[in-house]
Amino acid sequence: MSMIRIAPELNLVMDPETGTITQERKDSIQYSMEPVFERVDKLDAIADDLVNSLSPSNPLLNSWPGRENTSYMAGFYGNTFYGVIIGLAFSGLLALVIYIASLMRGVV
């Protein structure tokens, strides 16, 4: 945010954004907020990416194009794998219990 000095001997300045002309004061300091706004925009993009990471269909900030459903497919295949493993373990345990019960049926 810069000021245009209209008449330096009278301390008159103009704000180019609003078009107002005012007297320059020595006791006030004016800072440019552009670097702050750039960082806030960058943090906003990162926050949006964090929220998008919760949805499997939205692309992530640093991912390649065309990989929108990668998280969905990885979750599907991962859960299918663990489901098969747990199902086989449960079936094996059930078969073992049935086998032991059949062995004990002749003894008892």
Curated annotation (Swiss-Prot):
Pathway(s) per entry: One-carbon metabolism; methanogenesis from CO(2); methyl-coenzyme M from 5,10-methylene-5,6,7,8-tetrahydromethanopterin: step 2/2
Keyword Transmembrane helix: yes
Gene Ontology annotations for the cellular component aspect, listed alphabetically: plasma membrane
EC supergroup of this enzyme: translocase
GO MF terms held by the record: tetrahydromethanopterin S-methyltransferase activity
Regions crossing the membrane: 81-101
Record's bilayer topology term: Single-pass membrane protein
Keyword line: Cell membrane, Membrane, Methanogenesis, Methyltransferase, One-carbon metabolism, Transferase, Translocase, Transmembrane, Transmembrane helix
Catalytic activity line of the entry: 5-methyl-5,6,7,8-tetrahydromethanopterin + coenzyme M + 2 Na(+)(in) = 5,6,7,8-tetrahydromethanopterin + methyl-coenzyme M + 2 Na(+)(out)
EC numbers: 7.2.1.4
Single biological process term from Gene Ontology: methanogenesis, from carbon dioxide
Keyword Amino-acid biosynthesis recorded: no
Protein family: Belongs to the MtrB family.
Subunit architecture: The complex is composed of 8 subunits; MtrA, MtrB, MtrC, MtrD, MtrE, MtrF, MtrG and MtrH.
NCBIfam families, per database record: methano_MtrB, PRK00965.1
Entry function: Part of a complex that catalyzes the formation of methyl-coenzyme M and tetrahydromethanopterin from coenzyme M and methyl-tetrahydromethanopterin. This is an energy-conserving, sodium-ion translocating step.
Name used for this protein in its record: Tetrahydromethanopterin S-methyltransferase subunit B
Species in which this protein is naturally found: Methanosarcina barkeri (strain Fusaro / DSM 804)
